[in-house]
Regions:
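Donor-binding and catalytic core of enzymes assembling or modifying cell-surface/extracellular glycoconjugates
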Residues: 100-197
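Intrinsically disordered, low-complexity repeat regions enriched in Pro/Gln/Gly/Tyr
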Residues: 271-315, 319, 323
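Active-site and donor-binding regions of nucleotide-sugar-utilizing enzymes
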Residues: 1-36, 158-161, 176-178, 341
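Residue-level detector of alpha-helical secondary structure
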Residues: 76, 122, 249, 253, ...
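Active-site regions of enzymes building and remodeling cell-envelope glycoconjugates
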Residues: 1-4, 14-17, 22-26, 140-153, ...
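Basic, mixed-charge low-complexity alpha-helical segments
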Residues: 319, 323-345
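Core catalytic architecture of nucleotide-activated donor-dependent transferases building glycoconjugates
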Residues: 55-131, 135, 244, 267-270, ...
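Leloir-type glycosyltransferase catalytic cores
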Residues: 25-74, 203-276
Length: 345
């Protein structure tokens, strides 16, 4: 039940014991003998040892799958690349401090490393960045030959559909990798201050884990004690070396395979207006998925003075078939210029 379910307390909780399992206080978890799901299982069911659990599952309905498909197809049509990788560079603990972005828990990838990785991948593959934060990838990004997609999607089930339709996932210690596992997708996961045994799927055939913190981290006893010394010790655990960046890129390329150009024809979805209307409003897949086209402000764009990301999910222009049709399209573009214009700073 959702916590706002009517009479949830009166009908289902009041006559029962109310338990609050704490997986981070399970001995097997903080000694790297089980993962988070197994720790919950032990705490809830009073087990002495972890047991093998079935793989997580996410069941998407048809509207979610359609929304994800349209978003990915639109990205392909704009970037002209047929293979798509979703990149989730940051975890929930990422913070924007003035012109900088940092993760005090060292679970997110370093910004410099992320930019290097994406700039290499975007040359051959379509890249969708799964992040609420906008950050520049390079100088003069507006003029870059290879653009990336930054859809601001608030519904995590739509993100699940995007990951499902995409060809590969690249992420850190965050929810994206678990979505990829639940959907049987391939994934490259970069970990730093946390242990793969606790938070990921080491040894799984579809997962490549790049352990940047191996040999230079200690377990952070979250929800048990506050240990500033450990946090300081782990401070550099997610700083990626050139060799580790190469490992990440090579893993993605191996999983994605040989790049190829997009040869399909993307038809933008249209949402029907009121029944009395004879015309339908033009909306792209991103808007139909619940996203909002908002210009980034100073609070959402780190590093003031850097170029604003120029990629918006716009509909590809159809080639005219004759002169009269061409003139008609020109008139249409004049009247609808704002809807089709790529953002410029």
């Amino acid at each position: 039940y959702d916590h706002w379910h009517k009479n949830l307390f009166q009908e289902h909780i009041k006559q029962r014991d109310c338990e609050s399992p704490e997986p981070y206080r399970v001995w097997h978890y903080y000694n790297q003998k089980c993962n988070l799901s197994q720790a919950y299982d032990m705490a809830i069911n009073g087990l002495d040892e972890p047991r093998e659990l079935p793989a997580p599952r996410i069941e998407l309905n048809k509207m979610e799958v359609i929304a994800g498909y349209n978003i990915v197809e639109e990205v392909k049509s704009v970037t002209k690349k047929d293979k798509v990788v979703v990149v989730q560079p940051f975890g929930r603990s990422i913070e924007q401090v003035g012109e900088f972005m940092a993760d005090p828990t060292s679970r997110s990838m370093s910004l410099a490393g992320v930019c290097d990785i994406i700039n290499q991948l975007k040359k051959d593959y379509a890249v969708i960045i799964m992040s609420e934060f906008h950050f520049p990838l390079e100088e003069n990004e507006n003029n870059s030959k290879h653009q990336v997609a930054r859809p601001q999607i608030s519904d995590m089930r739509i993100w699940s559909a995007v990951i499902d339709v995409a060809d590969h996932f690249l992420g850190c210690d965050s929810m994206g990798q678990h979505i990829a596992r639940a959907l049987n997708k391939t994934a490259t996961v970069v970990v730093g201050s946390t242990y793969p045994e606790n938070i990921s799927y080491p040894g799984h055939k579809d997962f490549d884990i790049i352990d940047a913190g191996n040999g230079r981290r200690e377990y952070a006893p979250i929800r048990i004690t506050m240990d500033e010394r450990v946090d300081r010790f782990n401070d550099q655990a997610m700083e990626l070396s050139k060799d580790q960046i190469k490992q990440v890129v090579d893993s993605c390329k191996k999983r994605l395979g040989k790049p190829r150009a997009y040869t399909g024809t993307f038809v933008p979805p249209q949402q029907q207006e009121q029944a009395c209307s004879t015309q339908q409003p033009k909306q792209d897949a991103f808007q139909l998925a619940g996203g909002q086209q908002m210009a980034p402000t100073e609070t959402t764009m780190p590093f003031s003075g850097a170029p604003k990301p120029s990629f918006t999910l716009n509909k590809p222009k159809q080639k005219p078939s004759n002169k009269g049709f061409k003139q008609e399209i020109k008139n249409l573009l004049k009247s609808d210029k704002q809807a089709l214009k790529i953002e410029q700073k």
